[in-house]
């Protein structure tokens, strides 16, 4: 039998189920943590994170399915405010992207979550800066910054982090070609006051210069200037 509920009713029902699940997981996490059952507690934190991602995606859907013409724009404005993505070109002529969170693990629905806020941010950036910059032979760098309060045992393996959506979004803007022959990848982790993900695209010839600067990158990021040097044109 076909579901005769409206899209809004379906989304609200899903929201209710996810909220109940999150409440249950929250209670289980508290109990496990108090009892020092750390391995199972950690698994529950991952379940909670996964359900939270689904709830966020569903929450973005509800305003849109109401049919109001301004809904998509209104949702994007909220994301812009609540998930402040920073991007631009540094004084060295490097592309820099900063996101105020660690990227989710693979297989947790993270690609949709990332696309939801990163793609609109990239579109805004391209509207404001329309220079045709394309790095040819380049290095794509991911720097995962963990909060000083984060348990080192929970640092993520680099090959278990959802990167593809970010790479694809960045490639459209600043890479002539993201094939392995022209674009090499480098991954590293660091400790900071607040967790975040930093992405850089730099000319291959500048890699050792970036490595020398890496330990001294400020919490606020490398300074972005209005008229950077253009490489690879």
Residue ranges and their predicted role:
Residues 147-190:
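Short, hydrophobic/π-rich interface segment
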Residues 102-116:
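Acidic/glycine-enriched edge-of-secondary-structure segments
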Residues 75-84:
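Long, charge-patterned amphipathic interaction tracts in eukaryotic proteins
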Residues 87-91, 130-136, 191:
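Short glycine/proline-enriched loop/turn "hinge" motifs that connect secondary-structure elements
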Residues 84-103, 141-146:
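Short amphipathic
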Residues 1-68, 72, 90-94:
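N-terminal targeting/trafficking signals and adjacent low-complexity tails
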Residues 179-232:
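C-terminal edge-of-domain segments
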Residues 112-141, 148-150:
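An N-terminal amphipathic alpha-helical segment
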